[in-house]
Amino acid sequence: MEQVIGVIGGSGLYEMEGLQDVRSIVVETPFGAPSDEFVTGVLDGVRMVFLPRHGRGHRLLPTEVNYRANIYGMKKLGVTRIISVSAVGSMREEIVPGHIVIPDQFIDRTNATRANTFFGNGVVAHIQFADPVCADLSADLYAAAQEAGATVHRGGTYICMEGPAFSTRAESNLYRSFGVSVIGMTNIPEAKLAREAEICYGVIALATDYDCWHESHDDVSVDAIIAIIKQNVAMAKSIIRNAVRRIDRERNCPCASALRYAIITDKAAIPAETKERLDLIIGSYV
């Protein structure tokens, strides 16, 4: 199987030195339109697929992102691994704005307005999500960040809030009491849907601020976030480039068979319309 690596993040990530045969592709999905056109290319002999999570020009709120269409589109284009590049607030003193975190856990504080599963409409599945990121991909991202010269923290918990408003000070301190490392607004349900689609998922989290808990630092603001992101875009590209060289073509992780024992609905009971709609996701099992 051809290795195809997806990157979900800012719209500037695909403007990468060495990316060849760059094309924009409109992808239709049963779940509506993705955030924007997908950008494909070849980097060091590996096919890449990029998607600006919030659309070009940052048009979509975290709540408005069509996560199902985005992940389905990645699957349709043959992606087997997704690298998520995300701006986050630091919830720990030692994670300084400008540092990189490769989280390995999530806490979901989003609400029911986000569609967080491909299933329903006559088919029931329960994926294992105890370890929500791909350990192999995350290890490659950590090594790639070290190689790029980043100050990088391995592991930690990303708490995903609904937004779009930032936290109150009371909320920020509550989340710190949970022992989380960073806070963001986008990686859930993205990670859940990637697991349902049997796509490996790993995160490059760019710490931009201390949210609003740190008494010695300014509270989080959009202008501060943008300033740090601009500083870190080159670093994120370097990490991605290094990771692409490291990632094995073959997958030996459980992500590739996440649905093997997850679907509990009798095959004969699944409506034909649902089977057709989810054929790309469940076709090999039903």
Swiss-Prot record:
The record marks S167, V222 as: Important for substrate specificity. Homohexamer. Dimer of a homotrimer. Its EC number is 2.4.2.28. The keyword Cytoplasm does not apply. Catalyzes the reversible phosphorylation of S-methyl-5'-thioadenosine (MTA) to adenine and 5-methylthioribose-1-phosphate. Involved in the breakdown of MTA, a major by-product of polyamine biosynthesis. Responsible for the first step in the methionine salvage pathway after MTA has been generated from S-adenosylmethionine. Has broad substrate specificity with 6-aminopurine nucleosides as preferred substrates. Belongs to the PNP/MTAP phosphorylase family. MTAP subfamily. One of its GO terms (biological process) is purine ribonucleoside salvage. It comes from the Bacteria. The keyword Transferase applies. Pathway: Amino-acid biosynthesis; L-methionine biosynthesis via salvage pathway; S-methyl-5-thio-alpha-D-ribose 1-phosphate from S-methyl-5'-thioadenosine (phosphorylase route): step 1/1. One of its GO terms (molecular function) is S-methyl-5-thioadenosine phosphorylase activity. Phosphate binds at S11, R53, H54, S86, A87, T186. InterPro entries: MTAP (IPR010044), Nucleoside_phosphorylase_d (IPR000845), Nucleoside_phosphorylase_sf (IPR035994). Keywords: Glycosyltransferase, Purine salvage, Transferase. GO terms for cellular component: cytosol. This is S-methyl-5'-thioadenosine phosphorylase. Pfam families: PNP_UDP_1. Substrate binds at M185, D209, Y210, D211. It comes from Geobacter sulfurreducens (strain ATCC 51573 / DSM 12127 / PCA). The lineage of its organism: Bacteria, Pseudomonadati, Thermodesulfobacteriota, Desulfuromonadia, Geobacterales. The gene is mtnP. It catalyses: S-methyl-5'-thioadenosine + phosphate = 5-(methylsulfanyl)-alpha-D-ribose 1-phosphate + adenine.
